Amino acid sequence: MPKTQFQVDQNAVKKALHAAARTYDNVGMVPKAIADRLLERLDFIRLNPLCVVDVGARTGYATQQLEERYREAIVVGLDFSVAILKAASSKMMVGEYTALPFADRSVDLIFSNLAFQWSSDLQQTLQECHRVLKPGGLLLFSTVGPDTLKELHSSFADGHRHVHPFYDMHDIGDMLTQLRFTDPVMDTERLIVHYSSVPQLIKDLKQLGAQNASQDRLKGLMGKTQWRQMLTNYENCREENGALPATVEVIYGHAFGTESNSFKNANGEEVTVPIDKIIRRN
C-alpha cells in the first residue's frame, strides 16, 4: 500500500467533468501538450497492438491519435463522464477506472493521459490495468504530482485543503512494483503555465473539470476576506514579466504486464479478439 492514501469524492469528479463537457477543448492546451509528449514515447517502444484502450479519454484527442498510429488495432476510449464523451468522435465507452469493463488479459496497450489523479482508488485502478493487460502488454500513463498548483496551495495558508491532493511519483512506482508489473519506469517534469490573474487560473481549472474533489476539502462558499487574502498572497509569486505562475508537476510512467505465452494460439500467433469478446460481462 502507498504511504499516503487520498480519499476522492467520485461524485464531485463526475459533476465537475459533466459541467466542463462544453468547455474542455477550449482550454485544454496543457492536457493536449502532455498527451503529445506521452504519445511521442511510443516511438521508442516496439509494439504492434491488436487492442488499445485510452483510459480517461475525455473528448478523445489522444484516442484519435492512437487510431491513426495503430490503424489495424481496435482502439477504444473510456471515461466515466457520459457528458464529456459525447463531445468525442471516436469509439467510446463509459466505465469506471476501478472496474475496467474488459476481459482478463485482453488489451495490448493501456494509454492514460492525466486521468489517474481522479481515480477514487489509484491502487485498484492500477490493479485493474494489470488484470486486463495481456502478458507483455504496455501501460503508458501521465498524471500530476504534489507540486502541481503549489502556488495556489501555499497562497491559502489557512490549514484547509483547497487544492486536490496528488500522489508522489515514488508512491505510484511502489504501487506498480507491488502489483507485479514488469520493468516499471517513472520520471517527472515541471511545466509552468502563466496567467494574468488568479481568477483566470480558477476559471481555466473549472472549464477543465479540474477542481478539488478530495473528501476532506472545505465545503461551502469561501468568505470574501479569505479570498482577498489568497489573492494578496498569490501576488507575491508574480514574476518580472508581470505573469503569475502555476506549476504543473507532470509524472510519466510505463510498465508491462507479467510475461507469459498464454495469449498466443497453438501456432504461437497473436489472436485477434472481437470487441464484443473483449468487453467483460458481469
From Swiss-Prot:
Q: What domain of life is recorded for the organism?
A: Bacteria
Q: Name one GO biological process term.
A: methylation
Q: Which reaction does it catalyse?
A: malonyl-[ACP] + S-adenosyl-L-methionine = malonyl-[ACP] methyl ester + S-adenosyl-L-homocysteine
Q: Which UniProt keywords apply?
A: Biotin biosynthesis, Methyltransferase, S-adenosyl-L-methionine, Transferase
- SUPFAM superfamilies recorded for this chain? S-adenosyl-L-methionine-dependent methyltransferases
Member of which family? Belongs to the methyltransferase superfamily.
- HAMAP family to which the protein is assigned, alphabetical: BioC
Role description: Converts the free carboxyl group of a malonyl-thioester to its methyl ester by transfer of a methyl group from S-adenosyl-L-methionine (SAM). It allows to synthesize pimeloyl-ACP via the fatty acid synthetic pathway.
Q: What is this protein called?
A: Malonyl-[acyl-carrier protein] O-methyltransferase 1
